[in-house]
């Protein structure tokens, strides 16, 4: 007897983009464990499962003020582009940038002109007629470059990036840092450097790479080299400094930054509809 329901299958399909039968088989093999089911789908070759697994169903926008970034969600893109929704997001991010808050939870617990931010959002939700959610808020210190990206001209920004950097802080340095912010927006790195990747994530990638190679009937003697190559490919996909630069794809980002005299120390990337 299976230990999952049709709703579980749908959830896994929505999460990964895999087909119904593949999702059912993966859940069966994983005994209902979602994380294991995602691994099973990756080993079986489901395309882009790792990249799709962070998606959530939401509309909204990303707003910024100075060194702060905020994601405010709504139910439809119609509301996302209304003046009142855009103004609310801007009011909240400016308030967050001015005060000492550093997270969405702290921002929700703060007050604007004597009124709680959570209450303010609820009032606007009632006026607009849709559920509104303050999903994320972040703020960086030091020298920061900002980039916002619109997915459609008639919609507000859906992707926002903050890049904290040192080294050259003149106009040329700022241009280089903003170029990195554009890279982050487009290429979706999850980590700054290899050192930031948790050991359990690297181990999971090694396990998946080995299982996949065995499924492909690769020679046993070749497995270590194949696994190492696939783990390195993971780093090149998801680690910013290891990615090929969008300005010069023959060089990794770390080399381009070193040549420019810029060191990225931290970044934040928000995208509407992504976890």
UniProtKB/Swiss-Prot annotation:
One of its GO terms (molecular function) is translation elongation factor activity. Keywords: Cytoplasm, Elongation factor, Protein biosynthesis. Residues 76-79 are annotated as: Involved in Mg(2+) ion dislocation from EF-Tu. Pfam families: EF_TS. Gene3D superfamilies: 1.10.286.20, DNA helicase RuvA subunit, C-terminal domain, Elongation factor Ts, dimerisation domain. It is found in: Cytoplasm. Belongs to the EF-Ts family. This is Elongation factor Ts. It comes from Salinispora tropica (strain ATCC BAA-916 / DSM 44818 / JCM 13857 / NBRC 105044 / CNB-440). The gene is tsf.
């Amino acid at each position: 007897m299976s230990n999952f329901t049709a709703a579980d299958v749908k959830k896994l399909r929505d999460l990964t983009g895999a087909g119904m039968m593949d999702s059912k088989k993966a859940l069966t093999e994983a005994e209902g464990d979602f994380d294991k089911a995602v691994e099973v789908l990756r080993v079986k070759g489901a395309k882009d499962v790792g990249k799709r697994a962070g998606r959530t169903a939401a509309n909204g926008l990303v707003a910024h003020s100075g060194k702060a970034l905020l994601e405010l969600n709504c139910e439809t893109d119609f509301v996302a582009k209304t003046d009142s929704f855009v103004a609310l997001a801007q009011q909240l991010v400016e308030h967050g940038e001015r005060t000492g808050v550093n997270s969405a939870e702290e921002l929700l617990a703060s007050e604007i002109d004597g009124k709680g931010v959570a209450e303010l959002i609820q009032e606007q939700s009632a006026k607009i007629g849709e559920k509104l959610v303050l999903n994320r808020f972040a703020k960086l210190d030091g020298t920061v470059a900002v980039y916002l990206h619109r997915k459609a001209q008639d919609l507000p920004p859906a992707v926002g990036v903050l890049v904290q950097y040192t080294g050259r802080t003149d106009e040329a340095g700022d241009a280089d840092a903003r170029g990195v912010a554009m890279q982050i927006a487009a290429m979706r790195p999850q980590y700054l450097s290899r050192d930031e990747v948790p050991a359990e994530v690297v181990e999971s990638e090694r396990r998946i790479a080995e299982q996949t190679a065995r499924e492909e009937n690769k020679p046993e003697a070749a497995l270590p080299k194949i696994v190492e190559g696939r783990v390195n490919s993971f780093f090149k996909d998801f680690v910013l400094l290891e990615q090929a630069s969008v300005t010069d794809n023959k060089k990794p980002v770390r080399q381009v930054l070193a040549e420019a005299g810029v060191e990225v120390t931290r970044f934040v990337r928000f995208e509407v509809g992504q976890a």
